[in-house]
Amino acid sequence: MDIAHFRGIEQMSWRIPKGTHFLALIGPGDSAKSTILSAIDMALSDRWNLAITDSDFYQGDVEKPISIRVALSDLPTSIRHHDMLGMSLAGIDDASELYEDPDDDHDCCAVIALTVDKSLEPTWTAFRPNKPEPIATVTATARRLIGAYKVDERIDTHLRWSRTSALGRLTEAEHGADELLLRASREARKAVSEAIPPELSELVATIQQRLHALGSGEFKDLKPGLDQSLSTSTGNLALYEGPVPLSNFGLGSRRLAGVAAQQMANADKGIILIDEIEYGLEPHRLANLLTCIKDRTDSALAITTTHSPTALRHLDVDDLGIVRRDSNGTVTVKSFAPDQTYLQKLIRRSPEAFLARRVVLAEGKTDYGFLLELLDRWNAELAEGCKPSSAAIGAVAVEGSGGDTIEWARVLADVGYDVVLFIDSDVENDRDAADALTGNGVAVVRWKDGYNIELAVTDTLTASELTVLIDKAIELSDDPSSYRSNVLDHLHAYGLPEEVTTLLVEEWNEHGVGLDGARATVARAAHRRSWFKRVDKGRALAALLLEAEGYPDSDSASKVQELRDAVFAPAPEGRDTGAPDNPSNATEQ
């Protein structure tokens, strides 16, 4: 698929891996995900009267035409033998490179090219490489054989019988809609309850089965009925559940009912497009819809977009297409390699990472809580100055998983995410591996060599502040009354003389324990006995550091500032800027 000069896309070239049957496009807002679906729909649908305006041209520049080109392989016999399409086939290899003619080493493919110039008149032609001029016009009839459709969001339209609705087209295909609707309308003048021909009742029973499969609701008395909100006979026959029209149900139920009707009306079509698949659905119904679409055997390809962490939790990493758009309007869609399935752990734990523009990876629970506390304080400060928060710039904090965190950072950077890695520096191998990621564009922020987060904090505290830290660890434990003695045991195990029986660090000096020794002992005990190994405890640790008397002039303060600079840094040159799809068009495309 190649797109040029369409809405927020100045240029895009995308090759969907061979054998793909389901894809969920993800990425930050305004990265052109919905535009990609619209482009496929416009190029392959059988509509001839596309509603195109000047704002559909990239930056409103109508002097350069819109160009959308889609190559389709695995063609059904009806297309290969078609009078026009069958004579215009090209070749395509496993790497999606096109050839003028198919041969024994290539699959045959049909390449449909949609062009719109400043006259706003669309033209569809067949394309073959090395042919300078369009070789044939692709008619609406020919495009109908391709079988692509985008789920229509005009939900209530498809819950009524009319010439253009899904129910109307489904009825026309099976029974002849005009005659049935006329009969129903005439009978309705006598008695609404007896107005429904048996053919419609049988059809509704089939629709009810489909609604139940998609999880739309538990319908027991689904039937056609007259929608009194419409004044004409065209389209006032609608689906009812008992005495209530489905158009009066909640958004999720209506949307699933509309999806079911459209699926059935387009049962012969091989490409289904759904924008924002989670719209209006609770998590359990969203999960069921995803399963139904992924398991469909009658479609060659389903492409959806989503901003839902719930949706991602029910998908595999190889179901995802990561969409990125740079400041010049160049759009890329990348997928994870098959050997990167270990990222499934990350998508289950922190799906929001895949939906962000910038991912800030913290090594563990303590670091993650520490980072969250910093972000809250920074965002509050920015709000006072009317400046964008971390959420506004698309940055999200993500809890890592020890040794896996560095590899997660590498892979996320490879597929286009801005990544900030926040880790300890007490393990030499991890330190070296993290530093090596700077060549991949990862911003690595770590404490000075040999330091973990506990030591970075205690190294800044006074004796009385160390006592406050110990008291906070006890306060946040599961059983503070018994944990106090445990803490003393921990300290003895990591260097505190046995004769010291107090947790008041100010008194340790009387037993020969100076401030530097106290800091090291408390840090070792806190780290190895996991005093702060919980998100809320990590937050408390950050607060202790930020409120310490010596913090402003400390090395830890400079590292925290380095972290802040990385989180709020401008997007790297050429990366996704988050600008609207089309500055000349106020609505998101």
PLM region descriptions:
Residues 168-256, 261-271, 431:
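Extended helical coiled-coil dimerization/tether regions that scaffold
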Residues 37-106:
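Conserved P-loop NTP-binding catalytic core
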Residues 1-45, 232-353, 549-589:
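Switch/communication elements of ASCE P-loop NTPase nucleotide-binding domains
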Residues 22-23, 149, 359:
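Conserved beta-strand position immediately N-terminal to the Walker
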Residues 45-66, 135, 323, 327-330, ...:
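Flexible phosphate/Mg2+-sensing switch loops adjacent to catalytic phosphate-binding sites
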Residues 350-360, 366-589:
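Acidic, Mg2+-coordinating catalytic modules of nucleic-acid enzymes
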Residues 134-207, 457-464, 471-473:
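Coupling/switch segment of ABC-type P-loop NTPase heads
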Residues 84-174:
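A sensor for short, sequence-defined functional sites
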